[in-house]
Swiss-Prot record:
Effect the entry attributes to changing S828A: Reduced binding to SCRIB
Taxonomic placement: Eukaryota, Metazoa, Chordata, Craniata, Vertebrata
Protein's name according to its UniProt entry: Colorectal mutant cancer protein
Effect annotated for changing R506Q: In colorectal cancer samples; somatic mutation; decreased binding to CCAR2; significant decrease in its ability to induce the relocalization of CCAR2 to the cytoplasm; loss of its ability to repress the beta-catenin pathway; loss of its ability to induce the SIRT1-mediated deacetylation of beta-catenin
Source organism of this protein record: Homo sapiens (Human)
Motif stretch (PDZ-binding): 826-829
UniProt xrefs under InterPro entries: USBP1-like (IPR040171), USHBP1_PDZ-bd (IPR019536)
GO BP, one annotated term: negative regulation of canonical Wnt signaling pathway
GO cellular component assignments: cytoplasm; cytosol; lamellipodium; nucleoplasm; nucleus; plasma membrane
Similarity comment: family membership: Belongs to the MCC family.
Length: 829
């Protein structure tokens, strides 16, 4: 009997050890899950930081490109200035060469004059007055020549000075080209000061050159006054233009300062809002830390929090308002990517992050320039629209309609693909949410099963205790003599054995109940344990040796199983039931995988998406039909144009045919006239031969006359005159025929040339129309992109505000629910 009890006790201790190990493994699994969640959160934060770093790098590269563009423009401007100075120096060199030639000629004249004067000194008849006049006339060229040589020296010195200044400017420009793009502000200011000083030196040199040139022109060339006045007028105009540009620059700087002040105010407002958001986040975190855990917070705490706004990330499909596709068609059709990274406009977020810089001002100026170009295009179209014929306008309209229909077709296809993508995305999000619900329900069911198993085990022990107590009471009644004969020894032995078995069963049940109480004290935290018998969780999970010694000492414990222990066991059963009920409350309602959710708030969204998809398909078909109709119209217009060209060719061929017929008729009439003249000549010869009676019979016998008889009868002069007249008429007719043929050829050539010119003109107009359409579309795209970006920024701000308000409302609702709920020992997932 003792061996059986020991074996049973060993089995109970091994079962207890296995349960303790399973509890330790469950706690370790929970730690692993928590560590995995932390790892995923750190990975998300790392991805967010990488995105921010990439964005910062993109902004840095954009600023570097803008800085390079500014440097290139300034370099080109200074190179143009240097080129102008080179041209001025070349002109001055030419003038200096001309002055040198004039001085050489004057020196030659002076030498000739001196030779003449030396010859005149030998003459005795010359008086002193003529000598004085000659001396004065000699002194004037000497002074003039000395002044010219001095001016030449000054010009050469000035030329060397200008060459030195220009070499310095070129060195500055080359050094600016070779300098790196990452210059500091002090170095940039230093370069600007050097360039300004160089430009001042250059202006001073130009002024000195102009002054010397004016002096030279006034002293030596009086006819250069007009040129000097013209240059002075041009210089005055340039100075006025410079003053106007300086005033414009000052106004732009004032506007820039105002914009900087506005941006500073916006930054202060942004910093204030950020501080307020941080304060709200800290308050929420403090409220979350102080508030007790509840199963009602399970669904809200498992959702990720947006690090920028601190809101709970919810599904956008459940909060969005459905919009009909007909009302949303223009908005969807405008979604396009940016043209290029270099032409990317400056956004509002960049202005708020980096402040107002030169790139922003250049971008605004570029936008104004684009707008001015568009206005010029429309003004040109308006001013030159009357010169285009109706056929060209019709052709342009047909081509524009065809292109617009093609664009609308592509837009409708893009809308359909966008809606399909959104639908697939919503389905994927719904499936992921459904998978999360299934996982949550599986975890809850696993916990409920564990609680149910513990309850069943406790009920089995209570049943064993009740049965042992019942058998013990029955044995005591038998021992007391209730229901048995008084003198039966075998009955007494049976009663003693029954009492012994009842005591053993009672002892075994009490030991099992004590072990279960110890395990429940370790797992449930000893909320209902009695002092002296409670065991903490870390004591139950410390080591295997400790658990084995605890179980062995508990079996030999002198304390008996009291009613208080039984009540504790019943309290644990009630606690397990409460925990199981709390876990069941956390289970979510599941929908089918293959159908849409039937909730009231999501169903209208599904209907709106279905309507949007149907509308997008119908719009695509409509745009395809419009495109086909536009193409058919274009083909019909081309066929009509070919028909008109063929009709023109046919009319020209008919005119040629009429001309050829007239020519043939004229030739026929000429031939008939010649025949009539010959007949008249023959009749005149026959009437002259009627006087001879002897030849009448011969004439009657031979009706035709021979050539010899004709020569004998007609005079040679008449025949010669007729032949000359016939030859003259034939020449005239040939000349007229040649004139008609040449005129016809000229007409055909001119018509062909006009046709080619009209075709070329049509092609030029087509190209101009395509260029105008492309420019208009580009400007329209830019304007639409700007509007879209502003709308997106505004919607982002509104959504951020709404999400913050919604997050605060959710937090308030959760806190109110936690405060209103009674404080019980509830278990959260």
């Amino acid at each position: 009997m003792n061996s059986g009890v020991a074996m049973k006790y060993g089995n109970d201790s091994s079962a207890e050890l296995s349960e303790l190990h399973s509890a330790a493994l469950a706690s370790l699994k929970g730690d692993i899950v928590e560590l995995n969640k932390r790892l995923q959160q750190t990975e998300r934060e790392r991805d967010l930081l990488e995105k921010k770093l990439a964005k910062a790098q993109c902004e840095q590269s954009h600023l570097m490109r803008e800085h390079e563009d500014v440097q290139e423009r300034t370099t080109l401007r200074y190179e143009e200035r240097i080129t102008e100075l080179h041209s001025v120096i070349a002109e001055l060199n030419k003038k200096i060469d001309r002055l040198q030639g004039t001085t050489i000629r004057e020196e030659d004249e002076y030498s000739e004059l001196r030779s003449e004067l030396s010859q005149s000194q030998h003459e005795v008849n010359e008086d002193s007055r003529s000598m004085d006049q000659d001396q004065t006339s000699v002194s004037i060229p000497e002074n003039q020549s000395t002044m010219v040589t001095a001016d030449m020296d000054n010009c050469s010195d000035l030329n060397s000075e200008l060459q030195r200044v220009l070499t310095g400017l070129e060195n500055v420009v080359c050094g600016r080209k070779k300098s790196s793009c990452s210059l500091s502000v002090a170095e940039v200011d230093k370069h600007i000061e050097q360039l300004t000083t160089a430009s001042e030196h250059c202006d001073l040199a130009i002024k000195t050159v102009e002054e010397i040139e004016g002096v030279l022109g006034r002293d030596l060339y009086p006819n250069l006054a007009e040129e000097r006045s013209r240059w002075e007028k041009e210089l005055a105009g340039l100075r006025e233009e410079n003053e106007s540009l300086t005033a414009m620059l000052c106004s732009k700087e004032e506007e820039l300062n105002r914009t900087k002040a506005t941006m500073n105010a916006i930054r202060e407002e942004r910093d204030r809002l950020r501080r307020r958001v941080r304060e709200l986040q800290t308050r929420l975190q403090s409220v979350q830390a102080t508030g007790p855990s509840s199963p009602g917070r399970l669904t809200s705490t498992n959702r990720p929090i947006n690090p920028s706004t601190g809101e709970l990330s919810t599904s956008s499909s459940s909060n969005d308002i459905p919009i009909a596709k007909i009302a949303e068609r223009v908005k969807l059709s405008k979604t396009r990517s940016e043209s290029s990274s270099s032409d990317r406009p400056v956004l509002g977020s960049e202005i708020s992050s980096i402040g107002v810089s030169s790139s922003v001002a250049e971008h605004l100026a570029h936008s104004l320039q684009d707008c001015s170009n568009i206005q010029e295009i429309f003004q040109t179209l308006y001013s030159h629209g009357s010169a285009i014929s109706e056929s060209k306008i019709r052709e342009f309209e047909v081509e524009t309609e065809r292109l617009n229909s093609r664009i609308e077709h592509l837009k409708s296809q893009n809308d359909l693909l966008t809606i399909t993508l959104e639908e697939c995305k919503s389905n994927a999000e719904r499936m992921s949410m459904l998978v999360g619900k299934y996982e949550s329900n599986a975890t809850a069911l696993r916990l409920a099963l564990q609680y149910s198993e513990q309850c069943i085990e406790a009920y089995e022990l209570l049943l064993a205790l009740a049965e042992s107590e019942q058998s013990l009471i029955l044995g005591q009644f038998r021992a007391a003599g209730v229901g048995s004969s008084p003198g039966d020894q075998s009955g007494d032995e049976n009663i003693t054995q029954m009492l012994k078995r009842a005591h053993d069963c009672r002892k075994t049940a009490e030991n099992a109940a004590k072990a279960l109480l110890m395990k429940l004290d370790g797992s449930c935290g000893g909320a209902f344990a009695v002092a002296g018998c409670s065991v903490q969780p870390w004591e139950s999970l410390s080591s295997n040796s400790h658990t084995s010694t605890t179980s062995s000492t508990a079996s030999s414990c002198d304390t008996e199983f009291t009613k208080e222990d039984e009540q504790r066991l019943k309290d644990y059963i009630q606690q397990l039931k409460n925990d199981r009920a709390a876990v069941k409350l956390t289970m979510l309602e599941l929908e089918s995988i293959h159908i849409d959710p039937l909730s009231y708030d999501v169903k209208p969204r599904g209907d709106s998406q279905r309507l949007d998809l149907e509308n997008a398909v119908l719009m695509q078909e409509l745009m395809a039909m419009k495109e086909e109709m536009a193409e058919l119209k274009a083909q019909l217009y081309l066929l009509e144009k070919e028909k008109k060209a063929l009709e023109l060719k046919l009319s020209t061929r008919e005119a040629q045919e009429q001309a050829y017929l007239v020519h043939i008729e004229h030739l026929k009439s000429e031939v008939e006239e010649q025949k009539e003249q010959r007949m008249r000549s023959l009749s005149s010869t026959s009437s002259g031969s009627k006087d001879k009676p002897g030849k009448e019979c011969a004439d009657a016998a031979s009706p035709a006359l021979s050539l010899a008889e004709l020569r004998t009868t007609c005079s040679e002069n008449e025949l010669a005159a007729e032949f000359t007249n016939a030859i003259r008429r034939e020449k005239k007719l040939k000349a007229r025929v040649q004139e008609l043929v040449s005129a016809l050829e000229r007409l055909t050539k001119s018509s062909e040339i006009r046709h080619q010119q009209s075709a070329e003109f049509v092609n030029d107009l087509k190209r101009a129309n395509s260029n105008l359409v492309a420019a208009y579309e580009k400007a329209k795209k830019k304007h639409q992109n700007k509007l879209k970006k502003l709308e997106s920024q505004m919607m982002a701000m509104v959504e951020r505000h709404e999400t913050q308000v919604r997050m605060l409302k959710q937090r308030i609702a959760l806190l109110e629910e936690e405060n209103s709920r009674p404080h019980t020992n509830e278990t959260s997932l």
